[in-house]
């Protein structure tokens, strides 16, 4: 499993780093926006 940040721009997700995948690999993408990420991080006890 890989977690990669991306920017949504002009209807396209642009990855901020390359994925280590073979050509034609099928993947499932779960989208978590910045607001939700902040909620998750704020709710954690460190």
UniProtKB/Swiss-Prot annotation:
Keyword ATP-binding appears in the UniProt entry: no
Keyword annotations from UniProtKB, A to Z: Toxin-antitoxin system
Keyword GTP-binding among UniProt keywords: no
Described purpose of this protein according to its UniProt entry: Possibly the antitoxin component of a type II toxin-antitoxin (TA) system. Its cognate toxin is VapC3 (Potential).
Family: Belongs to the UPF0165 family.
Descriptive protein name: Putative antitoxin VapB3
Native organism: Pyrococcus furiosus (strain ATCC 43587 / DSM 3638 / JCM 8422 / Vc1)
Gene name of the record: vapB3
